[in-house]
């Protein structure tokens, strides 16, 4: 329960930051430098700004992308445990290089973003190309596989979370699932 509360708190903080940037003609850009988490966070925020979803959908997108990133990163940490697969993706010590972490994080974020914002796939493909990663399925490295596996596990779970993403988040609770007491 405490973990869930922490995740919800982080999502709310990110969402509040998003609300402060929506509608600005030139949003402030984070100086990402070499931090791939910031690079992919900016891709997520840019997608939200360009295709503004409802606030709850925006918060959900941020949570999914960052959970996929965390789960990919956790595979390369000796103690961290992924949210969906636990320690099942843990990589051997020899594989725990910065290059592998970067690649896994990028592939996880990429898959999550393409799933959430399919109309922007060309933008995400270009970002991956800029980072030196192929998105055509030719990269069969373990790091790419870790990223895809981590993201797929998160996406499979979130596709069943009741948000109805597959149908444009349409209300699937007709006539009404909730009847308030009078």
Task: Outline where the language-model segments fall.
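Acidic/polar surface patches and capping/hinge elements
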Residues: 26-182
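Bacterial N-terminal signal peptides
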Residues: 9-20
């Amino acid at each position: 329960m405490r973990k869930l509360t922490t995740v919800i708190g982080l999502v709310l903080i990110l969402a509040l930051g998003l609300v402060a940037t929506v509608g600005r003609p030139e949003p402030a850009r984070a100086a990402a430098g070499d931090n791939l988490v910031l690079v992919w966070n900016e891709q997520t925020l840019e997608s939200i700004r360009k295709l503004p979803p409802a606030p709850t959908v925006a918060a959900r997108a941020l949570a999914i992308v960052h959970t996929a990133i965390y789960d990919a990163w956790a595979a390369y940490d000796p103690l961290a445990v992924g949210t969906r697969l636990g320690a099942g993706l843990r990589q051997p010590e020899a594989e725990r290089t910065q290059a592998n972490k970067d690649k896994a994080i990028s592939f996880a974020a990429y898959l999550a973003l393409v799933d959430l914002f399919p109309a922007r796939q060309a933008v995400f493909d270009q970002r991956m190309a800029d980072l030196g990663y192929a998105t055509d399925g030719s990269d069969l490295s373990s790091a790419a596989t870790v990223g895809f596996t981590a993201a797929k596990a998160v996406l499979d779970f979130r596709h069943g979370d009741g948000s109805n993403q597959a149908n444009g988040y349409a209300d699937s609770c007709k006539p009404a699932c909730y009847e308030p007491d009078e």
